[in-house]
Amino acid sequence: MSTGKISIKTLLFGIFTLILVGELNAEESAGTALEESNLKKALYCMDILENRPDLEPSHRIEILRNECYSENFIEHAPNIEDGRDALLSLFASRYKKYPELSMSIKRTASEGDLVWLHVHVKHTPDSLGGAGVHIFRMKEGKIVEHWGVGQPVPKESKNNNTMF
């Protein structure tokens, strides 16, 4: 039989539950905001990297150096030298070799400090290009680590599915 009174134990449990739910929601919102910020920054950096032939190559490199890649950048792709300076040097040579280089982003995802981009890169407008996945670890608004995999887009496929 209910007397209409709430015990101190029940009241404290209710208060604790409300506080905990509020903290979890705040943490989730902060995590979501960080993930959105990391994704937005990675997309910005990839746009500067691959899709801005209107900018002088030296200006693109400076933007990438100052705004996108951490001084302590770590590269995991086995065909690319480690470090920010080596990576920026590679980009500078690519701009000379492939002045019509372009990239379209097909899919994105982010979780915590990681961002994934599924991309289609083309050296020239008429080339089939390549499919790639970039994984970036972000810290303080900059790319601090990169993992990448890629494969050429074939003329013919053994299935009816697209790579993108």
Residue ranges and their predicted role:
Residues 11-20:
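Bacterial N-terminal signal peptides
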Residues 1-12:
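Bacterial N-terminal signal peptides that target proteins for export
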Residues 22-164:
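C-terminal and inter-domain tail/linker signature
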